[in-house]
Amino acid sequence: MKIAVASSDGENVDSHFGKASKFIIYEFDGEKAEILDEREVNVNPAEKHQWIKTLEAVKDCDIVIAVQIGLRAKFGLEEAGIRFVSDEGPIEDVIMRYIRHYKFMKS
């Protein structure tokens, strides 16, 4: 499973989905997560539907983790079959919280 994490500094989940300029992509095998890729998004605050460009950057992912997301972007992710998780803090902590939740839900 691929997880995209919105981060401006590569260390913290600290970005709104539609305004995120970078995503760290992790591969989660059910036990641990490893970094696969870093993806840049050309953010243009004047662009009305920035979230569409952002969605293109993560369209091969199963989960997106960001601080917040707008309603249209959330529907766009859902239509693409991508689950959104709202969280913030150090990426390692956020990923571990998600893994614990995932394992709990699978048990």
Where are the model-predicted features located?
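Non-catalytic interface/targeting segments
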Residues: M1-K53, D60, E79, D87-S107
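Mid-chain, well-packed structural core segment of small domains
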Residues: L55-V85
